[in-house]
From Swiss-Prot:
Family annotation (Gene3D superfamilies): Hotdog Thioesterase (3.10.129.10)
Enzyme Commission code: 3.1.2.29
Catalytic activity reported: fluoroacetyl-CoA + H2O = fluoroacetate + CoA + H(+)
Parts forming coiled coils: none
PANTHER family cross-referenced by the UniProt entry: BLR0278 PROTEIN, THIOESTERASE DOMAIN-CONTAINING PROTEIN
Subunit text: Homodimer.
Keyword Hydrolase: yes
Single GO MF descriptor: acyl-CoA hydrolase activity
Record protein name field: Fluoroacetyl-CoA thioesterase
Task performed by this protein: Hydrolyzes fluoroacetyl-CoA before it can react with citrate synthase, and thus confers fluoroacetate resistance. Cannot use acetyl-CoA as substrate.
Active site: T42, E50, H76
Enzyme class: hydrolase
Organism whose genome encodes this protein: Streptantibioticus cattleyicolor
Length: 139
């Protein structure tokens, strides 16, 4: 990872919630999820928070590097219908070697809809993918 990321730096990422990012679409094979209202799913909100951190880190990664989420602790406090723009703010809290910790929050233009912390680890993609291949039946 290149130098330059500074604790306290903030990055924002906007996303217009489409109908296919609602609770019903998180696990479409689940009859239980089909009963939920058409609102932005917590699982998709978590993914959006990760995406903001990934984008913030991208300019600092060396060729062959990537990052993976290693921890997430967030609350989802308000419902967001499709069509609203969710803005995620990611603030870098710490850098410890290859581990980065973020404070994340999401706002839909009306309410803060979620907040918490997220951690990511910088990985060597080739090495990581080799380990994953060892876990597959074809190995």
């Amino acid at each position: 990872m290149k130098d330059g990321m500074r604790v306290g730096e903030r990055f924002t990422h906007d996303f217009v919630v489409p109908p296919h990012k609602t609770v019903r679409h998180l696990y479409p094979e689940s009859p239980e999820f089909a009963e939920f209202p058409e609102v932005f799913a917590t699982g998709f909100m978590v993914g959006l928070m990760e995406w903001a951190c990934v984008r913030a880190m991208a300019p600092y990664l060396e060729p062959g590097e990537g990052s993976l989420g290693t921890a997430i602790c967030v609350t989802h406090t308000a419902a967001t219908p499709p069509g609203l723009t969710v803005t995620v703010t990611a603030e870098l809290r710490s850098v410890e070697g290859r581990r980065l910790s973020w404070r994340v929050s999401a706002h839909d233009g009306v309410d803060e809809i979620g907040s918490g912390t997220h951690e990511r680890a910088v990985i060597h993609l080739e090495k990581f993918n080799a380990k994953v291949r060892q876990k597959t039946p074809a190995g």
